[in-house]
Amino acid sequence: MRAQVNSPTYTGGLWRKDRAAIVDPARLVWGLKTAAMSLGVRIYEDTKATSIEKDGVGVLVNTPLGRVRAGKVALATNAFKPLLNRIGHYVAPVYDYCMVTEPLTNAQLAEIGWTNRQGLSDIANQFHYYRLTEDNRILWGGYDAIYFWRGKVNTELESRPETWAKLSKHFFDTFPQLEGVKFTHMWGGAIDTCSRFCVFWGQAWQGRVAYAIGYTGLGVASSRFGGEVMLDLLDGRRSRATETKFVQEKPLPFPPEPFRFIGIQATRWSLDREDKTGKRNLWLRGLDRFGLGFDS
């Protein structure tokens, strides 16, 4: 492993060359936007959908500036406030944070190797993920998965100095050769976590509304599949996917507050403890038994 990427923290690793790839999420979204608009799709950015309601045989979408009437609605609200109350039982908005270094010099790159430029992740419960950018910076993120009281989501929470400090320490523990390298960009964002760690689907209002949600940070790779299944459900079309147990079943719901907040904090503490000791405590074993989990 250290012949590929030189870190004193590595004792082994697995390099998957056939089923993994690195994708720039921003460029992917911009490309999808261009493709959609070329097909006649109209996109109204920064227009907040505040609620939906039944409208005859269709659906009415309310916004601060007006209303949209539609025969059917596909909901992809992610970590933001769900427009169907039932979704809120299954999804918890969790903040994930990233940092990016200044461009590395050739000498610094030589110190760490990484000539094959793989995307990397460790296998801890509270894991880190990292990759090299086109201009030889290191994007470094993960570990902290922060749930705020009552699922709070706003732009103020996208900056968290205590997380930056923690991630910075972990970075230099992993690459002590890079001590002194500066971080030039830091940000955070909310993801839609559910107890089974991957997307789930549902319908409402006699099939007029369908949703795909709960990607738990895996949406860049799987949202195309999630969207296709959601559209099949919305059209009432049976497919191989819609007939599977995976699509038809939902994750176990999270408990209401304050038990949701307390439970998530207890789970984070327990996961961190397992990463340090290698032992899974009674709390985590209980969650395993009931098929519950928490992650980013």
Question: What are these language model-derived features?
Answer:
Residues K17, M186, I213-L218:
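Active-site nucleophile and cofactor-binding loops and adjacent substrate-binding regions
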Residues R2-T9:
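Flexible hinge/switch segments at interdomain interfaces of large molecular machines
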Residues R27, G31, K166, A221-V229:
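Short amphipathic alpha-helical face segments that pack within enzyme cores
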Residues W205-A210, T216-S296:
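C-terminal lid/capping helical subdomain adjacent to the catalytic/cofactor pocket in oxidative enzymes
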Residues R2, R42-Y44, K182-M186:
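General small-molecule cofactor/ligand-binding pocket signal
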Residues A49-S51, V57, R67-A107, E111-G207, ...:
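Active-site substrate-recognition segment that forms the wall
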Residues T9-K72:
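Helical element adjacent to the flavin cofactor pocket in flavoenzyme catalytic cores
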